[in-house]
Structures are given as structure tokens and as C-alpha cells.
Amino acid sequence: MKTRTATSAGFAAIWTLLCAVLLALLIFDLLPHFELLTQPARGDALREASNAITACSRFLGVALSMLVALCALAIPLTANVYTPKLIELFVADRLNRLVIGYFVLANAVVLWNDVMLGLSGAEVAARPRALVCVALTLVALLSIAPYLLYVLRFLVPQSIVGRIQREVVASIDDLGDETDPAEQDQALRRAVTNIQYLGKVTLRSIQRHDRDVAAEGLQALEEVFQAYQTRKPYLSPSALRSSCRDALGLGPELSLEIERKQAVIEVAILAELNLLLPVAIRVEVGEVVAQIAALTRHLGLRVAERGDAGAADMVTLYFNTFLRHALKTRSPDSFYKLVYQYRRFAENVLESAPQLSERVAFFLDYYAHQAVRMGMPYLLNVVAYDLAALCEAAYERKVHCRKRLLDLFIALDRDEPGILDMPGMVKAQIILSAKLATTGVEDAAGLLESELRKVPEEVLRETFGQIIAAREENFWEIADRRRHLDHVEPAYRKAVRDLRKRLTGVDEAGVATMLFMEEARKEAQLAARKGTREAPRPTPRGPKPAAPQEPPSEAEREEAPAESSGSGRRERSEPSPPPPSSLPPRRA
């Protein structure tokens, strides 16, 4: 914005200098011939004056046509892309009215002088008429380039957003100035309508993946909210009770609740965010989702600082609706971003509005189990970490609702199969128990330890190993939280090791021995597999088979005594199988 302003100022300075030089040249040329203006023009002088006026009339007509074509094409097309409000803004702009009105008036004056000079042939006024027409034409010529740049800059999306924002603030000021209830309703309706125009510009930008304009729109909504909160304490009660049901498009019950809580403007802004979030999730613009979540948190903090319980309650309702959108669209990334900002909101109002923090913790628990029922149980892990962080902040600040927050956190698993041993749930309980034990909150740490004894020992050993192995404080990918959730600060590591010894019976030396034995077992298995693949096929260990003999002759067969059998036939003996030790080993 600063660079753009500097560029505009530089262009204006250069253009003003050029106009001043041109004016000086005109004065320099006219001064020696100033006495000719009072003398009548005859013959060629009259024709020259008439030709000059005709040329000026032709040029002004072309210039006016060009400006009308520019405005008639550019303004509606841009309004179709962003918002119809642009046409109203363009018509209401004073500079647009001044420039277009000047071109129309200059055309009329020049055309009138051209016609009158041709009809009357006035010799005395010919030169002054021509001079006036030339002056009007020169001013029009010099204003074309600056006005063209002004129109193009008028159509920039950031400019549109800024103008609509000023319209909203002006409507809020009118709401405070008016005393008539009917006029107050009209001012409130204008403010809500302009807020919806801001939301429409942001929505179109998100659909077109225009993140810059979307960020400008969200920033404008936040600034409008801040301006309204600054003026709200000075508004009359009748203005705060004004109704705007048709503009918001809400049901009668919710509209009555909004009027009772005096949160019409707040709900109008939150309703626009509620329309923007599903679109941002669908087009996969994660930055916009994060900005919407952060903006909602900022709105909630501002109303909580003012003690506006009604508006703060509406913020929590819309936060819950956002979480529902993330679950319906099955967007884990959006759910993570929203839960993170929701937890930060509850953490920031722990001291000023502890009841609100407790409600937020309940809602986080509720939507975590909704995720489990919808087939996304892994989302419960991140909720467990956030509830643990909220409990840690509550015990650190010693707020009176800290025990209820801890009870909500402990009851998060509900002893349900598949949730009791969720890795994130177990890790969050271990880390929080270690931190509370280190800070001297033994009763809360004991409750968590008794809860952890329900977890199978194998799961506990693996979980403790993962926590102790997390040495890096920050996560190795781009994430909103930035911090590694499993990382434990060095001040709490001793408490983690002590807790592991109590729960699993394994101390540091035992863990090292177990790790060494596990590594040795794996190496032995690997060596066995490798040896089996490379070893030659062993020779069977049975008795050496007899050498093959020549078959007996006919005479030898006749002389051979008959075997002792009932039929006198010789039984053919079947070869016996080799002993098991002589069988080759099966290939692994």
C-alpha cells in the first residue's frame, strides 16, 4: 500500500509539472497577441476560428465516447466478477461525477459555440470563443490519462474492498447519529448489506484461488468488527435492539436470540465467515481456513474483553459450526486448525471468562467423539493434546475451574474400547501428569496416574519410549502449531522417567537393557535369515546307500532257493525312508 501511494504521488507530481509547463507556454504565446482578442475577426481569421472550434468539438466528442465505452464495459464486467455493489460505488464517487460531467459540459459549450459562430458570423466574439473552446479541450486532453488510471485503480479488488469497508463504517456511524427507530433500522440494514457485499467479494476470490484478495476481505471484516466494537458502547439501546431478520436470512427463534443479545453486527460478520469456510475447505485453500479460524478467535477475544457475554456465546456457536463443517467434509487439516484456535481462545479467556473456557472444553470433547463416531478416531489425539494444554494453563494460572477442566480431560477416553489406548490420548496424559507433578500439583498428577494404570503395559512402554525419543522441540514440517506435540522440556523429563518406573517397573537401566536385548534379538534373526539364504544344501546323514548291482542271470534265478512264503513267491521289499536327521532343512 505504501509503494502504491508513493507511485501515485510521483505520477501526480510529474503530471502537474507538465501541465504547468504547458500553461506557461500558452501564456507566453498569448501575451504578445492579447490585443487581437478585442479586435473583430474577418475573412481568413474568422474561418480559422471556426475551424479551431470545429476541431475541438470533434475531439471532445471522441473523448466522451471513449470514456463512456470504458465505463460501460469495464464497470459491469468487474461487478459481475466480484459484486454488483461496484456499480453503486462508481456512480456515487464524486470524482467520477466531476470528470464525466466536465466532458459532457465541455462538449455542449464547444458545440454551441461552433453552431453560433456558423449561424451568426459574429466577427467580434470569434477569437474569444475559439480561445475558450481550445482551453476546454486542452483541460479535457490533460485529464484523460490521470482519469484513465483512476478508473483502472478503482477496479482493483483491494480498492473495492476498501470502499465497501468505508461504507460499512459510515452506516455504523449513521446508526449512532440517528434517533428515530425507523432510521436506525435503515442504517443497520445498510451496514449488514455492505458486510454481505464484503463477504461476496471474499467468496468470489476464494473460488478463484485469489488468496491476496481473500486475505484483504477477511482483514476488512475484522476492521469493521473492531470499528463497531469501538462505537458500540456509545450506541443507544434502541439502536442495539434494532432488528434485521430479513437481511440475515435466519430463523425467527435465532433472530430473536440475536436481538436479545444485541449481537446483530457480530452475527452478520460471523455468518459471512460461515459461508466462506466450506468453500475454502472444498477448494483446499488451507491458508484461508487458518485465517478464518484466527479471525474468529480475535472476534471472540474482543467481545470477551468487553464483557459482552451474548456476543461471546454467538462466537462459540459459530466455532462449533465450523468444526461440524470440517467433520462433514472429512478435512482433518481444517479440523486441526480450528481446534487449535478454539483452544487458544479458551486459554486466553481463562481468567476473564472461566465459564466460557469450560464450555469450550466441553465442546472440544463433544466434537472429538463425533469424529470417532464418523470414522475418524485419530482426530481425538489432537483434541487430547489441546485439552492437556488448556488444563496446564488453568493450573498454572490457578483459575477456579481447573479441576473441572481436568475432569473433562480425564473423561475424554470414556473407557471406550479403541479410545482408551489411543496413542495421542496416552501421551497427553503422561506429559500433563509429569508437568503437574513437577510444579507440585500432586493431587491432579495422581488422578492422571491412576487413569494411566488402565492402559496395557505394552502400550505404556512403547508410548514412554516415543516421548523420550522426541528430542526436537519444533516439528519438522510446516504446521500452525510449529511445536512437536510429543516433546517434553528438560525440566519435566525426570518426572516422565519416574512415572515410567512406577507404571511399568522399568527404570533407565532396565530400558537400556531391554533395548540392548531387543537389538541383539533382531540382529540374530537377521543373521539367521542371511545364513539360511547363503548356506549350501547339506548332505543327508543316514547310512550310505548300497552300490547298484548287476541283475542276476537266468540260471542264477533258477538256482536261487525260494523264500519262505505261502505261495513260494519272493516278496519285494520296499526301501525304508531315511531317518529324520538325514532330511535336508526347509529353506526359510
Annotate each PLM feature.
Residues 152-526:
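Soluble C-terminal extramembrane regulatory/interaction domains of multi-pass membrane proteins
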Residues 8-13, 123, 149-156:
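Catalytic and GAP-homology cores of small GTPase regulators
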Residues 89, 121-142, 200-224:
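Hydrophobic alpha-helical transmembrane segments and immediately flanking/interface helices
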Residues 20-35, 45-119, 140-151:
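Transmembrane alpha-helix detector for multi-pass membrane proteins
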